[in-house]
């Protein structure tokens, strides 16, 4: 079964195990699938064929891994319960997961747990990293408004110049403790 339009462009697929899903157990596997508004500048065989769109963060790989898992599970069905395949849009620009949840993803397809994956180009081929809880960092947007006050050029002491204040804010960001700490631990190495 394949359901489209969860979170506008999300897709959900179901694969039932050898028991036809009767055990009631359900596991979600999730991959992000959005492209970024960037021009691909390489000539790899897997390069984007759509001008101005690029899977720069490996989302094409994430989607491929989930499709490969789906193919394997559909062929083997050597499990009990149901696997819910979640193809999430808008991961990079935010809101895709939230939109899918708001559209009733987990009411329609309740799961006991959800697992996701992310490539990590710096890791050796064949190694995997596992962790309970959050693994990758996220970005959050915020807005700072620095408001000055104009004055006559002969009386600068009567005004507030926002430029030096903005410079201090930018320099202050560089001292945030997160820039001094490693935000992720070393990955667990696979046994040889």
Task: Kindly label every feature range from the protein language model.
Residues 4-55, 60, 64-67, 71-79:
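Acidic/His- and Gly-rich active-site-bordering loop/insert found
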Residues 12, 68-69, 95-96, 165, ...:
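Residues within well-formed alpha-helices
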Residues 12-14, 28-30, 115-116, 143-145, ...:
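Structured core elements
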Residues 1-3, 182-192:
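Single conserved hydrophobic/aromatic residue that forms the stacking wall/gate
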Residues 36-38, 42-54, 60-61, 73, ...:
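Histidine/acidic-residue-rich, glycine-tolerant segments that coordinate divalent metal ions
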């Amino acid at each position: 079964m394949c359901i489209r339009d969860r979170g506008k462009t999300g897709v959900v697929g179901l694969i039932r195990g050898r028991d036809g899903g009767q055990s009631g157990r359900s596991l979600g596997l999730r991959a992000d699938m959005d492209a970024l508004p960037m021009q691909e500048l390489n000539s790899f065989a897997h390069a984007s064929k759509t001008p101005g769109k690029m899977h720069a963060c490996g989302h094409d790989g994430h989607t491929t891994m989930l499709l490969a898992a789906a193919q394997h599970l559909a062929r083997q069905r050597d499990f009990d319960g149901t696997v819910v395949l979640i193809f999430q849009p808008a991961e990079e620009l935010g809101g895709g997961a939230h939109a899918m949840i708001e559209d009733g993803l987990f009411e329609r397809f309740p799961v006991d747990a959800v697992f996701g994956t992310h490539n990590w180009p710096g890791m050796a081929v064949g190694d995997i990293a596992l962790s309970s809880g959050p693994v990758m960092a996220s970005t959050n947007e915020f807005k700072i408004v620095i408001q000055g006050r104009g004055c006559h050029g002969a009386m600068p002491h009567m005004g507030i110049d926002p430029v030096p204040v903005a410079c201090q804010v930018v320099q202050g960001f560089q001292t945030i403790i997160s820039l001094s700490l490693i935000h992720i631990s070393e990955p667990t190495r696979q046994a040889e």
